C-alpha cells in the first residue's frame, strides 16, 4: 500500500492534468482503465555499496483521462516532482526499483503495453546487483524505429531532478501526447536503468538487440540533464549521421526556439562515452543527444552547467543541489521553460520528421 504522501502527490498530479485543456494539435489521451497490470520481474540489489533507503513503490491512481497539459512541459514537470519524491535512485537500489515501477505504471496508464528487461551489473566495489530497462512501443506508419531513451537512476548525493528525472519527464510527456496519433516511424521509448554505473542499461540493451534490430533503427534520441544548464543543446556525429540534428536545428530556427549545437567535439571522457547514446553509436546507429549545460564555462568541456557561483562551482548534476527547490529558487522559471522547449522538440521529432 502506498504511503499517504505518495497518494496525495499522485492525486495532485493527475487532478492537474485532467483539468487541463488541450490545443487542436494535441487531442486528449483516452486511457483504458481496464488494461490489466503488467507482470514485472523483481529487481533486488545484492549488497550494493551505496544502497539508498527503501521506499514503498508509488502507484498511479486510476483516471478516466490523462490529458496533456495546456502548456507543453506541464506533464514533464509533474513527473520530475514524483520521481524526486522517491529520493536518490542509486543504481541497483530499492529507490531505483521504485522509480522503474513508477515509469512502468505511467506507460500502462497511458495505454501502452510496457515490458521490462532485467540485467545484472557490478558496482565499483565488485558487488553484483540487478537493474532493469522499461520499454514501451508506439507503432508508426513505418516499421523502422526511432529509439527515445532516458535513464532514470541518479547519483547517490542527489535527488536527480536534472540528472535525470528531467529526461524521463520529457519522454513520458511525449509518450502521452502521441499515443493516439499517427507517427511516421515506430517510436521505441526506453527508460534505462543503471546509467550512473557505467551506462549499464543502455549497453545491455544494445548488446542484445541483434543485427536485424540495429539495422531497423533509424536513430537513437538521448535525453539527459535537461533542466538545469544555462543553454539548450542537441548533439550528434558529423557527416551523414547528423541528419536528425540538422533537421532539429532547422525546426528550432523556424519556431524561434533557442536550441544550439557544438560541432566537431568529442563527446567522450578519456575515450569513454558519457551518456546512453554511446552504446548505440559504437554499433553504427546514428544518434542525437539533447542536454542543457554551458560549453563556454569552466574547462569548456560541457561539465560546468551554470555560473560557478551557483551549485558546486557550476555543477548541478551529481550534487545535493540537483533538486527542484534549489533550481526553482536559483533559476526561476528555468525548469518549466526547458521542459516546454525539449518536449516541443521531441514531439516534432516523433510526429514531423521523415527522411527525404
Regions found by a protein language model. Give the residues of each.
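Intrinsically disordered, low-complexity Ser/Thr/Pro-rich tracts
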Residues: 1-82, 109, 126, 356
